[in-house]
Amino acid sequence: LQDGSNEYVDEPSGDISGTTIDEISITIEENKVYLLNMGNTVGTDTPEIGSVAVAGEARGWMKVRVLQENGNYILQYADLETSSHNEVTISKTSGYNFTFFSLVTENVVEVEPEALQWDLNFTVFTEVLDLPGGGQTAYGFSDYVATNVLAETKAYGISANDNLNYQNFSLEDVDENALEIDQRIIGSHWRDVFTQSVTPNLFYIIEDSDGNLYKLRFTALVNENGIRGYPAFEYKLLN
């Protein structure tokens, strides 16, 4: 945990206007050079039962600059020590939220399905947390569930009680005012890593981009051997 590290990550709600890199200007001089922490390679070590090992070796830093020209992005990138740079033109991909480019393999890569073809993303995630003594920090979560906010997937959580639970919840019980466009609504709330179980009595209402309403609850965090990374859930269409 490091106070102030939240300043170097994108807005965790998924609000596209809250990226760390400023909006790309048509005026070249207004586009800054950014130092990019490349994070880690995907971990390959086998973790202890109930633990995770998602991060491998650190990948170091690069410097990047993004320009725009004729509706395309011009990505300039280089190692920190070099005085020259590589440059590639990246076109927007119709029907997709993003076009992804790997600075390691130096090519466009497929990461997500088409924008309207998915609702939930099971992933590692960088959240922003409040520190006990004040200030904020960036923090990495495993077993995180994000919603597709750019396709306006909405959700809210419900704590079951004696009168309302997952089994008897119906379309008439949906509170449309409670539906939110924030990719953290499910987040890490659905599971308890200390007990290796799902959060009891919690279920979710989800509305997809077509207006379909579902109820969903998680049934497992680990597999039969106690290994994380095997979430299970059930869901039902309400309308």
Could you describe each region identified by the protein language model?
Residues 1-239:
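Surface-exposed, beta-sheet-biased, low-hydrophobicity segments with strongly acidic/polar composition
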